[in-house]
Structures are given as C-alpha cells and as structure tokens.
UniProtKB/Swiss-Prot annotation:
Entry's family note: Belongs to the WD repeat MDV1/CAF4 family.
Entry coiled-coil feature ranges: 270-303
Full protein name: Mitochondrial division protein 1
Entry-linked PROSITE patterns: WD_REPEATS_1, WD_REPEATS_2, WD_REPEATS_REGION
Species of origin: Mycosarcoma maydis
Main location: mitochondrion
Keyword Iron tagged: no
Gene name as annotated: MDV1
Length: 814
C-alpha cells in the first residue's frame, strides 16, 4: 500500500465532524474542506507528480482527491452525467464540483464510509465502472474505512507546523504500536492481513534462503539430507520407507557410519563457513528485515485482537455474574416466600385441627361457630411465641410504611424493663423502673389501667390471650385477668372519689393516716389514693373485680424470667434456681438448681467445646476466681468450686457500654427460659445455655460459647438462638449440637425474638436490629424510633413493639 502524507497526517487527526442540518451548510463545509486540502497539500507538490494542479484524466486536484476516495464513483460516464445535469441546472464550475458528491443518492457527510460503500456496491451491481481490471482493492477498502478521519482532517485549517507535527505524531504512534502489548482498536483490514495463513510464509522462505546460503541444499542431486527423520522414526519403532530390511555385515555397517560421519562433517563445515561469510545478498537481507518488522507488527496486531477478545469475554463474564447475582437474589426471595408459606400452612393447619376438634365435642358446631366468629383468637393453642402463620390484622395495616414507628406510648417515667402483647392492635402490658405495670389498648394507643400489687420493679412478664403473668423484685409471681383491669380502674376511681367526699364530711377520717398497700392477699388498701380499701364486705368486692387472681411465692430473690404455656409455668430467679409451677393449683412441682448443674455435670453434659465449634484451649479451660473474669470456668473441672462459691453470692456483672455511653450492673442471673413439652432451655449468668429434662429436673446438655451472661434466648424445632452481654447472638443447631452461625454487634444484646425468616434484636442502640436469616443482610428500625438504646422488644408477624431507656414504647410496622 502506498503511503501518502494525507493519510499519514490523518492518523493524527481529531474527532469526525458532526452532522450538518441543511444542504447549504453541507456544501459550504465540503467546499471549505476541499480548499483546506489544497493548502494542506501544496508543500508536498514538488515531491510527487500526483499532487500537481492537473492530475489524472485532466481533473483538477479536488476532483483527483475525490476520485481516490471513490474510484468507482468518479468514472468518466458518471462525471459526464453529472456535468450535463449541472449544465441543465445552470450551476457554476465550483458548484458542479461540489455537486459531484452531493447529488449522488444516499451520500451523507455524517457517515461517509457507509455512504461510499453503499454507493460503490450499487455501482458495481449496476455495471458502472466495471471492467476486466476494475474492482474494489484493499487500498480502496482502507480509504473507505478511514474516510471519516480524512474528511475531518480536510475540514481543519492547519498550518505547516501543525501538519509536520501531525505527521511526526502519526509516525510515532505507528512505531509505538509495534511495542505496545495491545492496541485500543485494530482495523478490519489490518486484522485480516495479520491473521491470514500466508502471513507466516515469509518465515519458511527465510529458512530456505539461509539453508541454501549455508550449503545444506546446494547438492547436485537436490537437498542433502542426513537421514535424521529416518533415524527418529526407526528409534520409535516405525517402518522406515526405503531402508533395506536385510541385515548387513559389521564391515558394511562400519563403512556406512564412516560415510555418514564424513558427509555430516562436510555439511556442517560448509554451514559454518556460510554463516561467517554472509553469502546472502544485501537486497535479500533488507527484504528479510522488512518481513520481520511486518511480522512483528502482525504479532502485535494478533496480540491486540486476542486482548480485545479477552476483554470482551471479561465483560461478558461480568454481565453474566450480574445476571447470576440477580437470579440468586430472586432465589433468596423465593426462599423467603417459601418459608412464609410454610408458616402460613402450619398456622392454618393448626386452626383447622382445632376447629375439627371443637366440632367433634358435644355442642361442637356451636362452639366452632363461636370460635370462627371471634376471629380465631380462642382457637389458638400453645404459646404465641411459638405460634406460626398469618395473624388477623386490619387491612389498614398494609397501608403503613414498613420500618416506621407509627405509634408512641409515653406515660412511663423510667426505662422499660419488660413488655408483651396479646395480638396486633390488641392489649399491651409494659413494666418500667418507675415500679408501674401499665395496660394499653393498641387500637387507640390509650392506657386502660394498671396492674397493682407488686412492690418494686416488675422484671419479666408474659401475656397470652387475656392472661398475664408477672414476676418482680419482690420475689413473687402474680397471675392477672386482663378483662377485669378496666372495670377495676373505674371502681378505684369511684371509690377514691367517694372516700374523699366522706373525708370532707367527717373530721375523723381527715385525721386518719394515709393508707398504704398491704402485701397480703386478704385485703387491698389504698396506696397514694390509687386503690380501694376495705375488709369484711370488701373481700367479696376484691374477689369479683380485682384483676390479680393468684399469687405464687417460693423464690428467695428477684424473679428475672418466666415462660408459661397452657397450665405449666417455669420461672427463673436470682436465687440461681428454676421452678416449675402448676397454674391450676398454684403449687411448685419441681425445682432445678443451676449451681448444682454446674458443679455436677452428667456424662452427657461433659461435651468438649470443640464439639460445638470451639477449639480446646487453656484459656477456656482455666478456672476463674470471679464471674467478672475474661475467661469462663471449665464446668466439668473439680477446681470450679471456687467459682461456684462466687456464684452462690450476690451476682452482678458490669454491662459493656451502650451506644449512648451508659452502663449498669447486670444482676439477673437467669436471663431467659423457654420450654416445649418436656424440653426446657435456660440461659444464665455463667454464659451457659442449658437443656433440661422437666421429667427428671436434670440438665442433660450445656451449650458453651458465650463469654458473658446470657440475657435472652428462644428455641424452635431445630435451633436455639441466644443473646448475651458479649455483644453476640449465637444460633445453635440442635440436630448437630454445634453453633451454626454467630451474629456480632458493637454493643450488648438484651432482647431478641426470631422466626424462620428473621431475627429482631435489641443491641444497645437506638434502633431495633433486624437480621435476615435467608439473605444474611442486616437492617435497622430507626425511623421515628427511640432516642435512647432499646432494651426490650416483641413482635408478631408484621407488627412489633419495643421499649427503651427513653421511657417510651414504640409500635412498628414490619
């Protein structure tokens, strides 16, 4: 291919010109481009006879340039037709020259390469310009491919220095392209030239030339051969053509060896002499040098093409990875939907079983109809903490934005210590350090009344349907009927106002001391004017209206956790014991001593920490002199009695700082209890999670993993999930007996609840933490939320309640 200064400068040219809106502007632009081309080519006029004012066929310079760009277009027949049409239209010679391109159908300045290819193809198909020697050559294809930059270069008014710089830059770019590992782009024609099989023929030709020059192939009978291939084939056991299979004598074999050796020596000596004498001609060496440089360029082009293909493959891989990630996300969404449907199926199945059971009983159809009319609330069996399936909620709940607190209950004057509710938009009971237990109507957000009777703080409570059980720092457990709270509050208000009127009428009543609360169940007296007083006839009134229906005593210290289901209640207290109660009789039927379980581990309890995913280490086995130590004692060691002596005293543990920097002494030795059937799980201040058999009262397994007191736990058919002051939530697989996952936070965990899809936790921050068990993603409920760390929470389906140190209770839509 011939190299012209125009094409050399064009490799340095700038961006292609933008499209023009009208034919007038197109003609002006092309005219200016042709004039610029004249000025650009004038310095090179003496150097080439093809760049004069008159060129081939008598055309002037612009016509010659256009003929080079579109040889199939600028033929004699086409030019004559254009000239005749211009004459008929009365165009000037300059206009005629511009019209030669602009009047051609399908030509566009914005995409000249495409236009020229289309016009050339149409001309070939029509037979115009076709001859025995005519056709589209590689040079013409290259020009067509580079026409965008040719026109852009011609449209610029460049001076001689700029032209020289452009030419030098183009040559530098060509030289740099040979050394670069990859080019940003390779033309189609150049890539074809570099990859055709004939591009490697020069290498074989040069080998033959060197062989001839060195004497290997200059024999009178053709190329001289050493028989290397025959020896190689024979060594591999192949049949060698032309070799006599008859055995030869030792003398003949020796003579053949001598002959071959002499022949090889002569050939090698001639080869060495030939390489030293450089018998190859100068023209041949220059040709070989050009071939090598071209092949080096071809290697660079092929490398660029391979790099481009690899980059394209990488892009496709990224796209496929994005598609895979999207499909994986959809798969996780389907998994969540499947789990939700499983829970719904189980819940509906339970309701159906209850309905069938009611219908099978005497008077069953009426009872089933009443249960169905009540919305299914009375048909639920078991604790609501294990209840699955959809809940009955108003349709307005779907209109609430998820993750936003839409209700605030703010009558408490101290941090919330415990809370629970019956169902969404039902009844909520909350306890606080202000030593009050308040009952709320979640449909209106108003306080219904209070549960009066405990002296001190209520530390734990549970609500099921219309029954509430509370445990407090006064060592007692009380059972409440929530249906009586509102009427009892009204009676207290009426009694208090009536006694006040009586005092105003009687001076003796005004001199009486202020009433105080009596701890006995035989009478209820006025405390700060809140409750009624009386004995005798008042006893009957108390039995009828008092919401406290029973009081259970047995623990010697604060009751810190409880769980009840049906007629069975289990409580845990700071006296390091667990007690099982019969709610029908109010009697304690079983006492389980945690200290005894620590000091007397059974054979089934003696489970190594490595079995649960924790490696055995001296630091974990070393006994500690205090529960405040950083290491946990070996519960199966005989040396742990010193630790038990410390545990037998008053228990306290400093909590890690919360998000607001506050901390306190944690004194609840039993952080959480839950049972199902005869299986009981408890979390205690020594960091252990124990599994108890309620038939024998023995702890048959201890799950070790937490390094601080366990504050909360919950379990289902397959997992126990526990939270601790060590800032972690641990998920225990009951089937494998090991930790399946650990979720860590920056602050202590004080409360949690989970289902098959998510875990909600209070982790010492202002927001409620949400962990998706399917996607393993973390979230937080903060919008319109608490202003101090959250400490208690409870949720059902898409309805959650939380209480914090800011003394308020927040209601959330999940």
């Amino acid at each position: 291919m011939s190299y012209s200064p125009l094409l050399g400068a064009d490799r340095r040219a700038g961006e292609p010109s933008s499209g023009l809106a009208s034919s007038t502007s197109i003609r002006d632009t092309l005219s200016g481009a042709l004039n610029s081309t004249k000025a650009y080519l004038q310095p090179f006029t003496p150097a080439s006879p093809y760049l004069g004012s008159n060129g081939v066929n008598g055309h002037n310079e612009p016509s010659r340039l256009l003929s080079d760009v579109a040889p199939q277009l600028m033929t004699t027949r086409m030019m004559a037709a254009v000239t005749n049409s211009n004459t008929a239209l009365g165009l000037t010679p300059d206009g005629q020259r511009r019209a030669r391109l602009l009047l051609t159908p399908g030509f566009s300045i914005t995409s000249p390469a495409r236009s020229l290819v289309r016009i050339g193809g149409s001309l070939i198909q029509s037979g115009i310009g076709r001859g025995p020697m005519n056709g589209i050559t590689s040079n013409e294809l290259f020009v067509l491919e580079e026409s965008d930059r040719i026109l852009a270069t011609a449209a610029r008014d460049l001076d001689l220095e700029a032209n020289a710089d452009a030419q030098l830059g183009a040559r530098s770019a060509i030289e740099a392209s040979k050394s670069k590992a990859a080019e940003p782009s390779v033309s189609l024609l150049r890539g074809f030239q570099a990859t055709i099989p004939s591009s490697t023929e020069g290498r074989q030709r040069r080998r033959r030339v060197r062989a001839l020059a060195s004497g290997f192939e200059d024999g009178p009978e053709g190329p001289t051969k050493l028989g290397l291939k025959a020896m190689g084939d024979k060594a591999r056991g192949l049949m060698v053509e032309g070799v006599d299979a008859e055995p030869v004598s030792a003398f003949q074999a020796r003579e053949q060896r001598h002959a071959r050796r002499n022949q090889a020596s002569r050939i090698l000596s001639r080869a060495k002499e030939g390489s030293r004498s450089s018998a190859i001609q100068l023209e041949e060496l220059e040709r070989q040098l050009r071939e090598i440089e071209r092949e080096q360029g071809d290697v660079g082009v092929r490398r660029s093409l391979i790099d481009s293909e690899m980059a394209a493959v990488d892009d496709k891989i990224k796209v496929l990875e994005n598609i895979k990630a999207g499909l994986h996300k959809k798969l996780l969404g389907l998994r969540e939907e499947e789990l939700e449907l499983n829970d719904e199926h189980e819940g509906v199945g339970e309701l159906l079983a209850v309905q069938k059971h009611l219908r099978a009983m005497p008077g069953g159809p009426a009872a089933a109809a009443n249960a169905a009319a009540s919305g299914g609330a009375t048909t639920s069996q078991g604790s609501s903490r294990r209840r699955k399936g959809p809940l009955f909620m108003p349709s307005e709940h779907d209109e609430l934005p998820s993750g936003v607190a839409f209700m605030t209950l703010a009558d408490h004057s101290a941090p919330i210590t415990s809370l629970d509710f019956t169902e969404p938009y039902g009844t909520l009971v909350s306890a606080s350090l202000d030593e009050t237990v308040r009952v709320w109507d979640l449909a209106s957000g108003e306080e219904v009344g209070r549960l009066r009777g405990h002296v001190g703080t209520v530390k734990c409570l549970q609500v099921e349907d219309e029954v509430c059980i509370t445990g407090g720092s006064d060592h007692s457990i009380r059972i409440w009927d929530l249906t009586k709270v509102e009427n009892f509050e009204a009676r207290l208000t009426m009694t208090a106002s009536g006694e006040l009127r009586a005092r105003r009428r009687s001076p003796d009543l005004n001199r009486s001391p202020p009433p105080v609360a009596d701890e006995s169940m035989d009478s209820i007296k006025i405390r700060d004017g809140d409750t009624t007083a009386g004995d005798g006839d008042e006893e009957e009134v108390r039995d009828e209206f008092d919401p406290c229906v029973k009081r259970l005593e047995g623990h010697s210290k604060s009751v810190t956790s409880l769980y009840f289901d049906d007629n069975c209640l289990v409580t845990g207290a700071s006296d390091k014991t667990l007690r099982q109660w019969d709610l029908n009789t109010g009697q304690c039927v079983l006492t389980m001593d945690i200290l005894w379980a620590i000091s007397n581990p059974t054979s089934s309890q003696a489970i190594s920490q490595s079995e649960f995913g924790f490696p055995e280490s001296p630091s974990r086995k070393a006994s500690s002199s205090s529960i405040l130590g950083a290491t946990r004692p070996d519960l199966s060691s005989r040396d742990s009695f010193s630790v038990l002596n410390n545990l037998s005293g008053a228990f306290s543990y400093p909590t890690p700082p919360y998000a607001d920097g506050s901390w306190e002494m944690y004194q609840d030795f039993v952080g959480g209890v839950q049972f199902w059937g005869y299986a009981l799980a408890s979390g205690s201040g020594d960091g252990g999670v124990r599994m108890w058999d309620m038939r024998t009262g023995q702890a048959h397994r201890t799950l070790l993993g937490h390094t601080a007191p366990v504050t909360c736990l919950q379990f289902d058919e397959h997992h126990i999930i526990s939270g601790s002051l060590d800032k972690s939530i641990r998920i225990w697989d009951l089937r494998m007996g090991s930790i399946s996952d650990t979720v860590r936070y920056e602050h202590p965990v004080t409360a949690l609840q989970f289902d098959s899809r998510k875990i909600l936790a209070a982790t010492g921050e202002n927001g409620v933490k949400l962990f998706n068990r399917t996607t393993l993603q973390h979230g937080s409920l903060t919008l319109n939320g608490h202003t101090s760390p959250v400490e208690r929470l409870r949720y059902m389906d898409r309805y959650a309640v939380s209480g914090g140190k800011d003394c308020v209770v927040k209601i959330w839509a999940l």
